[in-house]
Amino acid sequence: MKNTFLNTVKGSLIISCQALPNEPLHSSFIMSRMALAAKGAGAAGIRANSVVDIQAIQDEVDLPLIGLSKVDYPDSPVYITPTIKEMRAVAATGCAVVACDVTGQPRPNGEKLAEIVATMRTEFPDTLLMADTDTIENVKVADKLGFDIIGTTMHGYTPATTGANIADNDFAYLKEVLQATSRPVIAEGKVDTPEKMKRCLDLGCHAVVVGGAITRPLEIAQRFISAL
């Protein structure tokens, strides 16, 4: 199954279908239809948040999924599949990939990332693990821990990378990431135009995830309204 996912999405677009509780489209049904639209457009895969959304999407489309679970804990800034509890729950859906935060910030309950990875390898040996990283240092951490896929997801979204954009200086950061690891790299985070997606692939990314620019109509509309 591991090679199947990587082969399926190689050189392609993965569409993130997510809506948090404070967003207008927050609904597992709506996310499943968003995934159906993504499939109709030719997406090679879907990235989805929460067990209920993942299951609803699986019922609607047969595309491979990157699953995650966003949960806020009072004792940690980490919120993307932060503990072994969420990792297990997402993996149990049968999604091809489980994504989690790899930003070096303290996890809830004092959990250690290395222990989480070891547990997942034992309990879900066929599930790919994707590292949502923010810096080159954490790309190297993820590589050393044996993550199957390196994502640039958190670049620009952590205290260490505030204000950063993947497209800055002709994608200089992404080029560094590609030099720092031999594992498949999936570009994600602020890839908001077809041209940026194509550039990521041309530079050597295995695939690209696009979310907000496609599946968040409130944000899309705001871009137009702000230009008035």
Swiss-Prot record:
The keyword Transcription does not apply. Signal peptide: none annotated. It catalyses: an N-acyl-D-glucosamine 6-phosphate = an N-acyl-D-mannosamine 6-phosphate. SUPFAM superfamilies: Ribulose-phoshate binding barrel. The keyword Isomerase applies. Converts N-acetylmannosamine-6-phosphate (ManNAc-6-P) to N-acetylglucosamine-6-phosphate (GlcNAc-6-P). This is Putative N-acetylmannosamine-6-phosphate 2-epimerase.
